[in-house]
Regions:
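Core beta-strand elements of the Rossmann-like FAD/NAD(P) dinucleotide-binding domain
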Residues: 4-6, 260-268
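Conserved small/polar residues in nucleotide/adenosyl-binding loops
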Residues: 282-291
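Glycine-/small-residue-rich beta->alpha transition segments that form the dinucleotide
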Residues: 268, 272-277
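Short amphipathic alpha-helical face segments that pack within enzyme cores
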Residues: 19, 127, 219, 277-280
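N-terminal glycine-rich phosphate/pyrophosphate-binding loop and immediately adjacent elements
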Residues: 1-113, 117, 122-126, 130-133, ...
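Conserved beta-strand-loop-beta-strand element in the redox core of flavoprotein oxidoreductases
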Residues: 242-262
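Glycine-rich nucleotide phosphate-binding loop and flanking beta-alpha elements
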Residues: 17, 40, 239, 276-278
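Conserved redox-cofactor binding core of oxidoreductases
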Residues: 73-74, 100, 112-237
């Protein structure tokens, strides 16, 4: 089945695509997002059950190789020094992240010049600063202003209260004479944007039943879909990126929620499927290219 041409096609409904759609929707264009996972049912999050630890470590494990949800895909980690942490669903990895939300530092953009490793970014912290600020507002970021180690910036919400573990760590840093500062967090410390403040309901890395943690399904996508021209289809698995004679993406072949093969064409294609899925999809093309 072939679908009509859209202006912008987005693959994946995680953090980067949520922000992209939020901005691009102001242009009055037609945007379609394809997500291979589902909308999350917050009643299924581990915090709703007495055996929450078991559920968190199994059905809501950060590794798809352990989770094995039908919308996941296995990842070979045999030769990797790190283990993958991701999630397939509306909200992407933010469903299971802890809400730890520090900004990049100016020095992070110049690691080659400053430290002799990696490569310098072609843009600076100053370039991204207004976008950091807008995203903090959209997400509902809480934090303590005034850290002298990073550029000063405004935050929409006061800091989340520090727990006993954080207090002990801070005391240790004080004894060592080390500078430390509570990190910005994407968890709302006060009622914000129609959501109730955090009540410490459960560990943040197992899904927030209350909605106080700013996963992008609650912070972005509900608002995105109220905008004219924006559509999100779930349980759609992209099989192949279609390209034109100039090797430019022009659409995709995907399987819809019923397993029907579909073609969707677009003027612009955005691949936003985390660090593994994005790279994988660049290899699922209609014909051979010379990309490394």
């Amino acid at each position: 089945m072939d679908n009509n041409l859209v202006d912008i096609l987005v693959i994946g409904a995680g953090a980067s695509s949520a922000a992209a759609v939020s901005n691009l929707s102001s242009l009055g264009v037609n945007i379609l997002c394809l997500e291979q996972g589902d909308w999350m049912n917050t009643n299924e999050y581990p915090s709703n059950f007495k055996n929450w630890q078991t559920i968190r470590d199994q059905q809501f494990n950060q590794s798809p190789n352990i989770r094995k949800r039908e919308t996941d895909y296995p990842i070979n980690e045999e030769d990797s020094e790190i283990e993958v942490a991701n999630f397939n669903g509306v909200g992407g990895g933010t469903i299971l992240y802890s809400g730890h939300f520090p900004r990049m530092k100016p020095s992070d953009f110049s690691v080659k010049s400053l430290d002799g490793v990696g490569e310098d970014w072609p843009i600076s912290y100053k370039t991204l600063e207004p976008y950091f600020a807008q995203n903090d507002i959209n997400m509902g970021v809480s934090g303590l202003k005034g850290d002298p180690a990073i550029p000063e910036h405004e935050l929409p919400l006061p800091p989340i209260a520090m727990g006993r573990m954080g207090e002990v760590i801070g005391q240790g840093f004080n004894k060592l004479g080390w500078h430390w500062w509570p990190s910005d967090t994407a968890i709302i410390s006060e009622d914000y944007d129609g959501r109730a403040k955090c009540i410490n309901l459960s560990p943040c890395n197992s899904g927030c039943s209350q909605g106080a943690k700013s996963s992008v399904d609650v912070a972005y996508w509900h608002k995105n879909l109220r905008k004219r021209g924006v559509e999100l289809k779930t349980r759609c698995r992209v099989r192949e990126i279609l390209v034109d004679e100039k090797d430019r993406a022009k659409g995709v072949i995907y399987y819809d929620e019923n397993g029907v093969e579909c073609r969707q064409f677009a003027e612009i294609v955005i691949i936003a499927c985390n660090g593994i899925g994005t790279v994988s999809y660049t290899h699922l093309r209609a014909h051979e290219t010379r990309y490394d």
